[in-house]
Amino acid sequence: MKTYIVGGAVRDELLGVAVKDRDYVVVGATPEAMVAQGYTPVGKDFPVFLHPKTHAEYALARTERKTAPGYKGFVFHTDASVTLEEDLIRRDLTINAMAQDEDGSIVDPFGGKRDLELRIFRHVSPAFAEDPVRILRIARFAARFPEFTVAAETNTLMQDMVTAGEVDALVPERVWQELARGLMEVRPSRMFEVLRDCGALQRILPELDVLWGVPQPAQYHPEIDTGVHIMLVIDYAAGIKADLPVRCAALLHDLGKGVTLPDQWPRHHGHEMHSVKLVDTVSKRLKIPNDCRDLALMTAREHGNVGRALELRANTIVNLLERCDAFRKPQRFIEMLQASECDHRGRTGFADKPFPQKAYLQAALAAAQTVNGGEIAELTRQRYPDQAQRIPEAIHEARVQAVAAALKKQPGDPKE
C-alpha cells in the first residue's frame, strides 16, 4: 500500500502557486485494508476514504470505462492491482497527470512537467474525448493560466468531440458551474477564446458566440467588434475582483446586439430589450442562479440609461431608482452600476477614463433615501383620506425634489 499526492496540487507546487487542496490516491490497497487502518468510507461512485486524523480524502487507484454519452457515462474499476500509471492515464491533461511520492519525488509518466515549462495544455490519451466536461475544464484552466495555450492536437480532438455531439450531452447545471468558475478566474476572456476555437461556444452559448463579427460605432467602441468588447468587459470585471453576479452581468448585458439586422449596423437601437429577452432565455436554459440572473437582466435593461445619467432629469433618475427597486435592494443597484462601469471601461483605450455616472447615481440614491416615506404617507392620508393613490405619487415627488437639490452640486445639474 502506497500513498501519492496527485493532480492539481502537484501542478501548482511546480508552478509556485499556493496549493489550496491536496488529492491523495492509494495504490495497492483494498477497501477492507483502508477500514482496518481507521479510514472512514465516504465515496458513493468509487472508494473514497477520510483519513482518521486529518479527515483528508484518499481515493483508491482506479480505472474507468466509457459506457454512455455525457460526463456521467462511466464505469469505474478499482482493486489492489491497479497501478499508479493506470490511475494517472485516465486524467485529462498531462499537467494534471503527475503524482508526488511520500519522499517528495515526482512521478511523471506523460510529460506533464515539460508541458508546464512549455505552458501547454495537452491531453493525456484519446480517452480525453470520452468526457465533454474536459472541454469546459481546459477552457477554465485557460482563464486561470492565461499564458498557456492548447496543443494543436488537443484542440483538434476537442473539435471532433463537438462535432460528435458530446458537448450536447452536458447537463445545463454543469455548464453553468464551469462557466461561473471560469468567470471568477484572472482572465475569463481566455475561457471563451478556447471554447470558440473548438466550436463549443456555439453549442453551449450561441447567443454569445454570434457577437463576434458584429460591429459597433467606432467613435464609442474603438474595438468595434462586439465580441471583443464583451471580452474586454469581463476582463475588466475580473481586474477589479468583482463578485460573480457582476461578472455574469458583464458577460450577458449586450446579447441583444447579436440579433440586430445587418442593415442597421453599426447602430443597435433597441438592443437593450432584445438583451433582456435573451438573458432570460439563457438563464432558464443554463439554470443560472437568481442573483446572477436578476442583475444581468437589470444591467441589460438599464446600462444605456446609466451611461446617459448626467443628461437625465431628476424625475427620470427617480424613475430609474424605483424601476430597479433600489430602495429595497440598494446593494443590487450598486452592483448594476459596477457592471455598467465595466461596460464603459471595457473598450479599447477606456480602462482609465472617468466614469462619473456611477458616483452621480449613487449620490442620487443617497438623496432619495433621505425621504421619509412613512411620514409622507401619513400626511397624505390626512390631507386626502379617500385618495390612497396619492401616497406613492407624493413619495415619488419628494424623492424627485431631494434628488434635484442634491445633484445641483454634481456635474450634470438635473432639472426637476
From Swiss-Prot:
It comes from Janthinobacterium sp. (strain Marseille) (Minibacterium massiliensis). GO terms for biological process: RNA repair; tRNA 3'-terminal CCA addition. Residues 226-327 form the HD domain. A single active site specifically recognizes both ATP and CTP and is responsible for their addition. The lineage of its organism: Bacteria, Pseudomonadati, Pseudomonadota, Betaproteobacteria, Burkholderiales. InterPro entries: CCA_bact, HD/PDEase_dom, HD_domain, NT_sf, PolA_pol_head_dom, PolyA_RNA-bd, tRNA_CCA-adding_enzyme. It catalyses: a tRNA precursor + 2 CTP + ATP = a tRNA with a 3' CCA end + 3 diphosphate; a tRNA with a 3' CCA end + 2 CTP + ATP = a tRNA with a 3' CCACCA end + 3 diphosphate. ATP binds at residues 8, 11, 91, 137, 140. It comes from the Bacteria. One of its GO terms (molecular function) is cyclic-nucleotide phosphodiesterase activity. Belongs to the tRNA nucleotidyltransferase/poly(A) polymerase family. Bacterial CCA-adding enzyme type 1 subfamily. Magnesium is required for nucleotidyltransferase activity. Mg(2+) binds at residues 21, 23. Its EC number is 2.7.7.72, 3.1.3.-, 3.1.4.-. PANTHER family: MULTIFUNCTIONAL CCA PROTEIN (PTHR47545:SF1). The gene is cca. Its cofactor is Mg(2+); Ni(2+). CTP binds at residues 8, 11, 91, 137, 140. Catalyzes the addition and repair of the essential 3'-terminal CCA sequence in tRNAs without using a nucleic acid template. Adds these three nucleotides in the order of C, C, and A to the tRNA nucleotide-73, using CTP and ATP as substrates and producing inorganic pyrophosphate. tRNA 3'-terminal CCA addition is required both for tRNA processing and repair. Also involved in tRNA surveillance by mediating tandem CCA addition to generate a CCACCA at the 3' terminus of unstable tRNAs. While stable tRNAs receive only 3'-terminal CCA, unstable tRNAs are marked with CCACCA and rapidly degraded. This is Multifunctional CCA protein. Keywords: ATP-binding, Hydrolase, Magnesium, Metal-binding, Multifunctional enzyme, Nickel, Nucleotide-binding, Nucleotidyltransferase, RNA repair, RNA-binding, Transferase, tRNA processing. HAMAP family: CCA_bact_type1, CCA_bact_type2. Monomer. Can also form homodimers and oligomers.
